[in-house]
Amino acid sequence: MKLDVKILDARLHEQLPQYATTGSAGLDLRACVDAPLTIEPGTTHLIPTGMAIHLADPGYAALILPRSGMGHKHGIVLGNLVGLIDSDYQGQLMVSTWNRGSTAFVLNPMERLAQLVIVPVVQAELNIVDDFAESERGAGGFGSTGRH
């Protein structure tokens, strides 16, 4: 798949988003901030990535996901938990960054902050019914299938 990318921050020309390994599912997104940014515990910041994408094909969407090390080691996660980028969106990708930790975190310019994953999408056609055919699970939820 080819992905149309518009570079909005010239610094990205030297550090284009890339897959870290051949098995990586996500492209690393960088923090296009001009100076180190201190993210205090409990606060959120909207961080520009310096790029825009256009998927164009309604059969795809993009997800902005946290990098595992940022959340586990530093408490830095996404303020919206997952960012959903629709196929027709063409604006700059922004990362809602939340410090859920107990200490301040300094985000440096061009630091890898999140990852972008392209996923297939199926748009469902709603079929209104009065009843469902019975299934083994039925309406059981929230732990109804057991713990182990």
Swiss-Prot record:
Substrate binds at R67, S68, G69, N80, L84, I85, D86, M94. Pfam families: dUTPase. GO terms for biological process: dUMP biosynthetic process; dUTP catabolic process. Keywords: Hydrolase, Magnesium, Metal-binding, Nucleotide metabolism. Belongs to the dUTPase family. It catalyses: dUTP + H2O = dUMP + diphosphate + H(+). NCBIfam families: dut (TIGR00576), PRK00601.1 (NF001862). HAMAP family: dUTPase_bact. Coiled coil: none annotated. InterPro entries: dUTPase, dUTPase-like, dUTPase-like_sf, dUTPase_trimeric. This enzyme is involved in nucleotide metabolism: it produces dUMP, the immediate precursor of thymidine nucleotides and it decreases the intracellular concentration of dUTP so that uracil cannot be incorporated into DNA. Its EC number is 3.6.1.23. The keyword Transferase does not apply. It comes from Ralstonia pickettii (strain 12J). This is Deoxyuridine 5'-triphosphate nucleotidohydrolase. CDD domains: trimeric_dUTPase. Pathway: Pyrimidine metabolism; dUMP biosynthesis; dUMP from dCTP (dUTP route): step 2/2. Its cofactor is Mg(2+). GO terms for molecular function: dUTP diphosphatase activity; magnesium ion binding. The keyword Ribonucleoprotein does not apply.
